[in-house]
């Protein structure tokens, strides 16, 4: 029997990299069911794509990479959520507006939310009070990388060593 019944891991995955994969694999080992959610269409995403033409940043590329990972596991499902119209007045992402969309996917019995960011804790406590926030490799010791670091790497070969 696994530690948790239902877990969720969401993100933009820009690009999908080894750290993301490690978090998904951790969730898959610990949960009976894992909902992996790709959010796309936020202003920050559009700004990133405008300034960075990497083939790994397109929505299609991210969906393809996630599908290739998820299909290996019986207890994981991929969901795609368009957040284009869910913005605050200043144009920034509105995670609180996204919460009802996530609830449609995971229901009200979410046991655990996965991330590698302790700073997400206040939002997760507010949005999913019944769930544990499981922080995976927050010091990035196993995979010392982030999407932002990868996007800033100029050398394509260096970038590709982190991408799944």
Label every PLM stretch briefly.
Residues 1-164:
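Nucleotidyltransferase catalytic core that binds NTPs
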């Amino acid at each position: 029997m696994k530690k948790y019944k239902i877990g969720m891991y969401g993100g933009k995955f820009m690009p999908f990299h080894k750290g993301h994969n490690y978090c998904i694999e951790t969730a898959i080992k610990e949960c009976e069911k894992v909902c992996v959610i790709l959010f796309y269409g936020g202003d920050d995403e559009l700004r990133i794509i405008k300034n960075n033409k990497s083939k790994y940043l397109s929505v299609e590329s991210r969906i393809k990479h996630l599908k290739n990972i998820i299909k290996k596991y019986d207890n994981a499902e991929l969901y795609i959520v368009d957040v284009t119209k869910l913005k605050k007045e200043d144009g920034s992402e509105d995670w609180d507006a996204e919460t009802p969309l996530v609830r449609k996917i995971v229901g009200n019995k979410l046991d655990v939310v996965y991330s590698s960011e302790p700073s997400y804790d206040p939002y997760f406590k507010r949005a999913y009070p019944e769930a544990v926030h499981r922080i995976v490799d927050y010091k990035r010791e196993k995979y010392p990388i982030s999407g932002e670091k990868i996007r800033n790497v100029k050398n394509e070969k260096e970038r590709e060593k982190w991408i799944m």
